[in-house]
Amino acid sequence: GLGWLDPLFQLFRSGNWEAIGALGEGVVGAFGQIMVASVALLIAWRQVLVDQRLTTQQNRITQAQTIDSFIHGISELISDEEGMLEDWPLERMLAEGRLSAVFGSIDKDGKARVLRFLSHAKLLTPLKRDYRLGRAILDGEGSYEEDRAAGVPVIRLQQLLKGVDLSGTDLRGVDFNGADLRGADLSFCDLTGANLAGTNLAGANLEQARLEECRLFYGRPQTATPRLGSAPFDLATGAGTGAVVENVNLASARLLDPQSHHYLATWSGPRSRSTLPGGTKGVPSQLG
């Protein structure tokens, strides 16, 4: 099995020390070259890792600057010299255009940060307006009065979030105000306190999403129905105020309250009902 070593044994037995020395130098030289090449490869690999880390950090810095610039620009665009909200139709269109542009250059965590800012600043919430100039009306408590029935938001999300990947992001308290979320990936999201009433969630992924205190409709779950385009709705009964939830993936969705569970069991359809935590026993489907 070691016959391939016979030439070496013969060389040593011959006593030809010059040949033995030459062989030793060759072996040591080859081993040294291998070691040098290995060290060079290791250094090159470490350099690649360092470059990747620096690139990632630079991208984060650039994204943070982009978001900060967007927030500053929007704030200046829709406020007057006294710091009051002033959003004429052109300014609202420009604000929506800026939002659409910035969404194309940031990752999902950046998108979530922008959505939280817009929502907490009440720029996505329909606001009560006066009927002469269309200005937002103060509520007497340092904020602007909401008007879910006939109000106008500063920014409409419309189809901006359709099919967007927001998985694993922090969307707590975001007011989506009827946005089109068809096919969006909201898996593992924290949607605590978010307002999804009137949104279109058809085909969206809510696997393991946290839905604590998340609003899917107004009124009562027994009388609430999904929104139908621009059809009239009733905030008291909930008719026409609910989210469209057909074919939503609800596997392992967390902290659903009984009202939301009832609504989802009623209006999500057979595919979604099979993924709804807690089952659907005793709640008939309205979608067949």
Predicted features along the sequence, with ranges:
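Short amphipathic alpha-helical patches
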Residues: 47, 51-54, 58, 122-126, ...
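Membrane-proximal alpha-helical anchors
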Residues: 3-97
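Hydrophobic repeat-domain scaffold segments
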Residues: 63-168
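Tandem repeat scaffolds
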Residues: 13-41, 133-288
